[in-house]
Every structure is written in structure tokens, then in C-alpha cells.
Amino acid sequence: WREYEKQADELVIELDPGRAFGTGSHPTTSLLLKLMEEQDFTNKTIIDIGTGSGILMIAGKLLGAGEVYGTDIDEFSMEVAKENLLLNNISLDEVKLLKGNLLEVIENKKFDIVVCNILADVLVKLLDEIKYILKEDSIVLFSGIIEDKLAEVISKAESVGLEVAEVKEDKEWRSCRLLVKK
């Protein structure tokens, strides 16, 4: 555990990642958190696909999201996410944490913001499902993309009706903000 003195303009997330992914220190997580900070989450409906430690759900809630969903296929990650939500004073009644594949657990729901920090090969597969949960003005924030896989992710995203608005980089890792094509 690290002690940290919060600055006046900061939101601080407390985490015990256990064996779940997402401590905030990995470049993919920090890149996605930076992208999240640049968006307006006020009263938005968001989903964190592959929630892991729950760090992105927590960030979304702290940034003002109205409805926050998180999905994961791993039972252990679900437990870690629950613990971390509670550690950050977020009641499990305030969020929806769902175990299972995306379209199996999300029925007829559309989201303003989709966040996902998973390896590129998984992102490419998920895009076929993500397209069904987007609104006309949704924002999609992806991370977990190694440099040489970025073109593949972008190509797939474009094939399902998204366009790249921004790419951030840290060492060999890439993160991107995607918008629904008008």
C-alpha cells in the first residue's frame, strides 16, 4: 500500500487489485484513465467491459457518471471489483456488476461511453458485440493495444461504424478514443 496525500483538484482511487488486472500503474490503465479524464461523464451511462479490478468503473463513478455497468467473465475479478468499489465508498446498489459475455448480460441497453482495457485481439472480437450497445453519439475508449496491433484494431473499429478521434501512446502501448461515424 502507498500512502498518498490528495491534492485539491484530484480524484483518488483506492485499490487492492488482488490478482485482477488494473492497478493504474500499467501504461494501458493510465492511458485510459487520462482519456476518461478528458470526457464529460456527468449523468452519462457507461460500461466497463472486462472490468478486472473495477478501476475504470470507479473512475467513471467519481467523474460523475449516472449509471455505471461493469462486466467480466472471471468470477475472481468480479469479487475484486466489488471489494474495490466498496473501498471507494461506492455502494453495490449504485452500480451494476455483471458476470458473463457482453451481449448475454446486457440486453437492449445502449451506453453513452464504453471503456475497455483488454488486449487488442480481444478488442477486435468484442467490436462485433460493442456495436450493438452504442448510441448515435457514443464515445468508445480503448486501451491495451500494443503498437503493432493498432492498425488492426482501427480497421475493425471502422468496419463496425466507428472512427478514430484520438490516439495516445506510452512506450509500446496505445489507447484510443473512437466515435460513432455520422
Language model segments and positions:
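Generic hydrophobic-segment detector
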Residues: 8, 12-14, 50, 71, ...
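Non-catalytic substrate-recognition/targeting regions of SAM-dependent transferases
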Residues: 1-22
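Conserved SAM/SAH cofactor-binding pocket of Class I
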Residues: 19, 23-102
